[in-house]
Amino acid sequence: MPDRYDVLVVGAGPAGLAAAHTAAAHGARVGLLDAQPRPGGQVWRHDVRRQAPRAARDAIEKLHGVDVLANHSVVSVESSALRVEAPQGSRSIAYGSLILATGARELLLPFPGWTLPGVTGAGGLQALTKQGWPVTGKRVVVAGSGPLLLAAADTLRKHGANVLGIFEQAPATTVRAFARQLRHWPARAVQAAGLRLRLAGVPYRFGSFVRRAHGEDAVQRVDIESPGGMQTLECDLLAVGYGLVPNTELAQMLGCAMDYLGPHPHVSVDRLLRTSVEGVYAAGEAGGIGGLAVARLEGAMAGHVATGHSVAAHALLPQRDRERRFGALLSRHFALDARLRSLADNDTLICRCEDVTLSELDGFTDARAAKLATRCGMGACQGRICGTALAELGRFPRNGARPPIFPARLATLAGLTTLPSDDAYRGS
């Protein structure tokens, strides 16, 4: 495969697939890079029992003339190129234009017991289940916030799990107000109705959240605070997720400007998805959480603009703006309860990679100082879990990103040619 592409797309989810297809249709030499073994991203992850959704298979079949670079993880940035970790070793891939379709990750908030075996993210357990992790007959509690809880519970039931309940932190009045607005997006209303129908018989509680998980070698029971008081449920698995956070590490390393919705950054783009860095575009969740429809539309737009076809991108703006309004509606109605930010006690592990408790982080004003003193954020996830949680808790924001973006071989790290000054990573 070549080491230079006219258009290089990072991320093979819905946005990346649309971007790669569109750019290739304009005659560009396109590379589509993703860390996973198959295209589709998190939302279109292959299900060992049911395959990928039809929309995903159709999108993948359209990748004519696109080099799909599976199992390729970005390590660092070079001059108009990315240093990646590939199955055969490290390689540098140059580009004329770069489209960031890096998606999002689940927001996990710490509470006592959240590191027990059997406690996962809601989306995380959904992904594990699709990959074949056995859940048949398991008693599962699903909790957190947003429509992802329903999708996760639906997948779990299809794979034979006994879903004991779905516990949504947003109050009932807010969720009902959101549901009434779905009439403006009929397709989403139909999708929501289908989910509720398939989940008939599963309790769906509002204004409720996990206070604590208990267990010896694994989770055994969970305390849930609800408007009616505290209740305890015995369970085998606990899946808790509080929505999504954009993946911006690569964009920050490239020097792209960021915008903020609350404590979490997303890539700042103009109407045609151009970032502050010449030749770099951002599509989908990287530019702010918007959902599947936004990702597909913005991916197509980025593919048009990156190949010099801005008129075609302009034609998609009305649809994109409509879907972005849905994302804003979702953010407003599922805003997090302030009580969720004070669940962790002094002994709660915040950085599970390096076993750092909340009390060990007292007195630090920035992430860099905390990292130097405690190793918080220096594990395999590179602060994606603990750093994001700490930003949500108001401890210190994540500003900047360091190489490696993902774990890499020592030989790869030794060969890095671009290491910006330490000032570029203050706060990371």
Task: Describe every region a protein language model picked out.
Residues 2-380, 384-427:
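Residues forming the flavin
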